[in-house]
């Protein structure tokens, strides 16, 4: 039973995750709309981009613009938890979006109710404050689920991120004394998001600052087969999105409904064999059994892993309870040299 089935690689119409990092005067929103319109129209003649706004309604400022107006708009309000971003993205997908802008994705990290606030409010079992790496464990797990969901979305995503100075402490030689001293240097700009966010992106652009440089960018990440579209020093236009659509359209189409079913099957299998077969026997799933059969080995592997993990967790919890009882008894019972061990 193979966990991974290997076959000849095919260039499929993978979803593009485009990240744009910039200051408030870099023109991120307008530039995102230009790309989104070019991409949406290139994918479908009557295509329209969707914009999910977290900036107190500022995303609607271009609603009547002669060039980029007419897009679909929705507002996501606090709390900016990963789960609410997942819900908002899901709502756009259900509404038929092919291309979605999120302005700004930074709020999931540092906005009201975002990951930083979640980590800072983490408590111990006794109600005390957690600190250090421990407090980040569960919040980062929730963030990872959002990124996993984003990577499997059926839409192309343009994510606007706020920028901040990338400051670093370095050793620098003091020529007057011949000694090294600690100095803070500015390495440029970085995004207000989790530090590994870039790894999940197809393309990452750092927007230039200043009204006279709106739309100009520096390429921070771009795969080789898209470098003819994105070049440092270029200015974003609707043609940028159209070129991206052309690249997508030249690749093999994906069966979106089958992919959605496969992802649902994997999610069900991740809850164990029993939950998977409940999903497998749903009346909406049964007609697709033949199409889903090639994925059955993977479903089985995932459900087995889930059941094994659950069994280990149950055993660990039982051992923990037993240990706690033994420790409690050892504190109250008198020490007997002839019988030092206290057993259940």
Indicate where each model-derived feature is located:
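Phosphate-binding/switch region of NTP-binding enzymes
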Residues: 23, 144-239
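Conserved inter-motif catalytic segment of the P-loop NTP-binding fold
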Residues: 23, 43-141
